[in-house]
């Protein structure tokens, strides 16, 4: 289950180096064998306290060419901001729901923030399905922002490989 506890939010085993945070994050994800998809459809479901800031992330995804799909409450906030968004049922609301979309390759990326034990439990099937179908998944708004920065950097400069020796020379100057 890829949900992050407090002790896991700041650990990692790969390093990405770039001129910007976005470039470095993109490379780190690639190094962790978790390449960020550059197109498709993003599923967004946000806890209430994240919805206002989530609109900013949704706008970034739209600017990058992604389509949006969201649960009813999140979709209402995104739609009020003037963005096109399709609505999908939560698992408990009946079919077709988000797990069906994931299984049918209907989304390429999931941004799902939760709060409380019940919401975390309810989202377990989404996390499990995303993992089983290799759908990129993040559980925080900051993760969504990082994804957008990574994709913006990739769009601007591509993915450049740099030798560590050259980086060390730059630092020594």
Named regions from a protein language model:
Residues 1-104, 109-139, 144-149, 156-173:
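ATP-dependent carboxylate/acyl-activation modules
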